[in-house]
Amino acid sequence: MIKMLQLPFNKKGQVSFDFIIAMLFLLLIFAFMGQNVLNMAKSFRDSETAEHAHAILDSFENYAIMAYSKDVTVNATFEPIGNLNYTIMLSNKSISVNSSTNIIFQPETDANGDYVSIKCNNVDNSVNTIPLNAVRISFGDFTVSKDEMEVNIR
């Protein structure tokens, strides 16, 4: 009679079961790591967009200050950030920047004092609840604001 070779352990399915459990555990770990990487990439993209928005707000304020302090009319061109369109919101206007947009900063005076008038070809004259010395940029998903400008704008 021929005797078959036997494995040194009796639980023949145990090795494959342990291997499956280990692979599932590794898959779970890599899924969590991948989710963290994707969230971090989205956060980087949002922070880069916010940095661009702050730069636009600083430029907007600089043009308004230059028009006010030098008593000159300034014509500035604002463009979308890559393929991101945005809306510049003032106290009584909303300017949609969907393409190259020319904005005119003109110093004016009325009974309430001096201010810088903002004129543009695609202005929506809506009443916003924004103070005269504040500007906001909306990207739809989030809004970046500058609430303490040096000059009043309308």
From Swiss-Prot:
Secreted found in the keyword field: yes
Cell compartment(s), UniProt = Secreted; Cell surface; Fimbrium
- GO terms for CC? cell surface; extracellular region; membrane
Keyword terms: Fimbrium, Secreted
Q: Does the keyword Secreted apply?
A: yes
Give the location of motif QXSXEXXXL in residue numbers: 14-24
**What happens when the protein's gene is inactivated?**
Deletion of the gene leads to completely nonpiliated cells.
Q: Which top-rank group of organisms is this from?
A: Archaea
Task: Give residue ranges for the propeptide.
Answer: 1-13
* Post-translational modification, as annotated: The N-terminus is cleaved by the prepilin peptidase EppA, which recognizes the class III signal sequence.
The free-text function statement in the UniProt record for this protein reads: Minor component of the type IV-like pili. Essential for pili formation.
Q: What is known of its domains?
A: Contains an amino terminal motif QXSXEXXXL, which is part of a class III signal sequence.
Q: What is this protein called?
A: Minor structural pilin EpdC
Q: Which organism is it from?
A: Methanococcus maripaludis (strain DSM 14266 / JCM 13030 / NBRC 101832 / S2 / LL)
**Lineage, opening ranks:** Archaea, Methanobacteriati, Methanobacteriota, Methanomada group, Methanococci
